[in-house]
């Protein structure tokens, strides 16, 4: 079922002229994230082998259609942080058909560096979601949500409108420019405490503030000598 659905997706994308499909991969080992009960040696490795066995045939179809798949690094998926992203890419032999959808909101509550991630995986950033999160760790809550609903003030973190959280957006946009990213930048809006018709336009305006034009010449070129 997975192969058939994703193969149809690749063909449909190609028919519409879409060159990048964003989505999730699933994971047969996410339930082992706590590593307890103790994980049998080789079980994690087998999970990445299972991922490759499922996805390489799918990516063959994507290759044939001239379409790329951008996996969103996200809890519950095969790649959910820095090192699991390395492992997922290695499992597929770093084939170009498989890249990443960068969504820094999922980095914030894990204390991952989104800017360093962009640099280290710069050849795999196929799409960017501008989505925001904010931590509220107070010694009584944690990172796993405590089975509390979105927007509950007792949570340790929550999604908020872009510009109201902990993502260093200026650094993100500067790094995107540094790595030569020229793909889509999409505002993905989620905030349990704000009306979307207010929040989404405001988020777009805030993010556009950081999308400034690059310089046409080095700022210190005038001091270089040689030209009058």
What are these model-predicted stretches?
Residues 19, 56-57, 64, 79-102, ...:
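Histidine-acidic metal/acid-base catalytic patches
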């Amino acid at each position: 079922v997975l192969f058939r659905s994703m193969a149809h997706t690749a063909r449909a994308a190609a028919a519409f002229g879409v060159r990048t499909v964003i989505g999730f991969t699933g994971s047969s080992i996410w339930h082992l994230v706590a590593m307890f009960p103790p994980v049998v040696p080789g079980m994690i490795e087998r999970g990445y082998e299972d991922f490759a066995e499922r996805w390489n045939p799918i990516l063959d179809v994507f290759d044939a259609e001239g379409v790329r798949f951008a996996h969103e690094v996200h809890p519950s998926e095969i790649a959910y942080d820095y090192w699991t992203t390395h492992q997922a890419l290695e499992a597929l032999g770093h084939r170009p058909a498989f890249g990443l959808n960068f969504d820094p909101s999922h980095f914030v509550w894990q204390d991952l560096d989104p800017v360093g991630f962009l640099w280290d995986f710069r050849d795999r950033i196929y799409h960017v979601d501008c989505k925001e999160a904010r931590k509220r760790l107070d010694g009584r809550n944690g990172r796993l949500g405590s089975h509390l609903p979105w927007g509950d003030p007792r949570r340790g973190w929550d999604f908020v409108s872009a510009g109201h959280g902990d993502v260093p957006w200026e650094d993100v946009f500067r790094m995107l420019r540094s790595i030569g990213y020229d793909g889509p930048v999409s505002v993905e809006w989620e905030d349990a405490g704000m009306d979307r018709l207010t929040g989404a336009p405001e988020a777009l305006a805030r993010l556009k503030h950081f999308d400034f034009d690059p310089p046409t010449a080095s700022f210190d070129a005038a001091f270089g000598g040689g030209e009058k």
